């Protein structure tokens, strides 16, 4: 598995501390909040913390989950992090058996089978994978506490994927390739062979014959590149020679820096607009994907240098803007960290 956090990684302490401080400022900030919530009756009209005793902050549930992923990752890759004691105290206070039971109880109510599908599902599994990587008493304790929720989303993936006739190729939360990439990472770390086999089978069925990608992007509120996340996703389940042959068909003109749109960082006209601010996320997620893709080509392949150059341009375009307005501040550092830690 070739995910960015599957290997030891280096990050400058100042950057790690900046990202940690950002996440700590919002993971327990309850408001403003955009709920993904079906009311089954009048008694379901409750504040976020009553609905989600663990993941109630960061504007929305999925951003809160990956805010915890960011903090858990920094705790592992930056051992001298100044914020480490605050992070441990946060996890001890929030990732508890009682809190997780409340999250599972929410899922078990009627009309909530599609809650956070597939984006929030995938990020919860990424958090679970990261906690497993710690190999510490803390990590084992948090992994055990989170396990019922982890198991619930593994079960949802296992039930849903065989029923899904088509992938979703949008550049937003619904993108299937992104969810499969993160689910694949969890399956690898947790040695969940049934999930790994299912993810690989769905990727082959949905993307294996794709060729001549036109890359009709960006969309106005994209934060993922449908083209690049598909390439990144396929690299997780195909052996390198097979993946390279697939890439020759999928994006045959990369050596000529085509499609041109994949090499041009997007502009962001209004960072106070939550949808337009997604475009900073697109630059950061493209940087992550380009770096991950580059690592799968041999050092003498000219596409490796081309991909790394594209990654640096995209990272430089949006890294300065992970803070400044809460529209982006509640989530962008996660994608910056993915990019920074990718080889």
Q: What label would you give each PLM region?
A:
Residues 187-331:
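Long, repeat-rich segments with strong aromatic
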Residues 3-56:
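Low-complexity, Ser/Thr/Pro/Gly-enriched N-terminal "stalk/linker" regions
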Residues 37-50, 96-111, 146, 161, ...:
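Basic/polar, acidic-poor N-terminal "presequence/leader" segments
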Residues 65, 74-187:
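Extended ligand-binding groove/face enriched in aromatic
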Residues 12-23, 82-98, 137-160, 192-210, ...:
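Extended, well-ordered alpha-helical scaffold segments
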Residues 26, 30-43, 60-91:
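Alpha-helical solenoid scaffolds in large eukaryotic transport, assembly, and signaling factors
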Residues 8-13, 49-65, 105-122, 163-176, ...:
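Solvent-exposed loop and edge beta-strand segments that line ligand/cofactor-binding
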Residues 4-11, 68-81, 122-138, 179-191, ...:
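Well-ordered alpha-helical scaffold segments within catalytic/enzyme domains
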């Amino acid at each position: 598995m070739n995910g960015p956090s599957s290997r030891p990684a280096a990050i400058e302490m100042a950057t790690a501390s900046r990202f940690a401080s950002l996440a700590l400022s919002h993971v327990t900030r309850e408001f403003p909040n955009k709920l993904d919530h079906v009311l089954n009756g009048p008694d379901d009209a409750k504040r976020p913390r009553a609905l989600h005793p663990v993941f109630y902050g960061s504007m929305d549930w999925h951003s809160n989950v990956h805010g915890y992923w960011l903090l858990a990752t920094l705790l592992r890759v930056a051992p001298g992090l100044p914020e480490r004691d605050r992070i441990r105290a946060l996890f001890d206070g929030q990732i508890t058996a009682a809190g997780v039971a409340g999250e599972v109880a929410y899922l078990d109510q009627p009309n909530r089978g599609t809650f956070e599908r597939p984006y929030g599902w995938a990020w919860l599994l990424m958090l679970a994978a990261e906690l497993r990587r710690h190999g510490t008493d803390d990590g084992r304790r948090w992994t055990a506490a989170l396990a019922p929720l982890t198991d619930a989303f593994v079960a949802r993936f296992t039930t849903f994927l065989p029923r899904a006739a088509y992938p979703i190729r949008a550049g937003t939360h619904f993108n299937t390739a992104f969810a499969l990439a993160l689910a694949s990472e969890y399956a690898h770390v947790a040695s969940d062979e049934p999930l790994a086999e299912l993810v690989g089978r769905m990727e082959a069925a949905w993307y294996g014959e794709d060729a001549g990608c036109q890359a009709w992007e960006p969309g106005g509120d994209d934060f993922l590149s449908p083209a690049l996340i598909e390439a990144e996703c396929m690299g997780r389940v195909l052996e390198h020679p097979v993946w390279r042959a697939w890439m020759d068909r999928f994006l045959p003109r990369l050596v000529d820096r085509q499609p041109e749109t994949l090499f041009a960082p997007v502009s962001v006209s209004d960072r106070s607009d939550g949808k337009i601010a997604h475009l900073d996320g697109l630059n950061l997620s493209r940087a992550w994907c380009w770096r991950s893709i580059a690592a799968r080509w041999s050092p003498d392949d000219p596409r490796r240098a081309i991909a790394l150059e594209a990654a640096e341009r995209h990272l430089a375009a949006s890294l300065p803007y992970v803070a400044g307005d809460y529209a982006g501040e509640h989530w962008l550092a996660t994608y910056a960290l993915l990019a920074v830690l990718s080889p």
